[in-house]
Amino acid sequence: MTPIVERVSEDRVGVLSSQPSTKRSYSRGLLVWNRLPWRSIATIASVLMAWEALSLSGAIDPSRFPSPEQTFRATVAMIERPFAGHTLFGHIGASLVRWILGVALAIAVGITFGAAMAWNLTFRAATRPIFEFLRYIPPLAWVPLAIIVLGPSLSAEVFIVFVGAVPPVIINVWTGVAGVDPVLTSAAKTLGAGSLRTLLLIALPAATLNILTGIRVAVANGWASLIGAELVGAQSGLGFIIITAQTSNRADDILTGMLFIGLIGALTDVVLRTTTRRLTFWYGSSL
């Protein structure tokens, strides 16, 4: 075979070998494209366009309810310059720290307490009346007491998040562990596992879906509780942005705070829902 023929053959092989790679890349890109929530994107875009159109037409008074453009400008200004002592991301960071600490504490206490209530009848009988009483007190009702006892501090804000987040964790862990198939626990004990070992290695893993569901609800409750607490007892955070903007009659800054409260909550729920679906894939795709 001549050098020219060999070179042509090599070029053909290279072209043929690159075709599957190109097809795979195209298929992967198409899959990502199809997975995008186009209906949600279209709905959000439609709402924004209608909102802007109503503002431009005068149907909505921009001085009372700002347009999307005004809200965007207020957001950019808050990112670039401090608002009430912090930039926008400084306020977001303050809220996230309180939220994470409170929810983490609620998860640790909730799993321990809920598992104990499901596993030990004596403990359940002693603690259930108190728990049932306390869980019906709204988290915001604790704010004045928390400020008096703990002062306007990080501890008070974390406590409010904890109060709002811990009940769903306890309830879901309790019902999940109590609902584990008795055959599984009996088999473990027959093989020599003690009560604590059976709880840790059999009952809690079997209640994974309930636990993750409780955590997902706790995260949402904790976020809502925190924002409420920041409205009355904080010097930073997204809730503090809203109440400060209200005193200065700045509706665009209020909407900026509300926008990021909703965005952070929604994105967190998407992450938790995806994590739950992947960790409990055997339950199907309805999660």
Residues of each region from the PLM?
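Short cytoplasmic-facing helical segments at TM-TM junctions of multi-pass membrane proteins
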Residues: 169-214, 238, 242
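Periplasmic/extracellular loop-to-transmembrane helix junction in inner-membrane transport proteins
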Residues: 28-29, 57-104
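Transmembrane alpha-helices
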Residues: 159, 163, 195-229, 252, ...
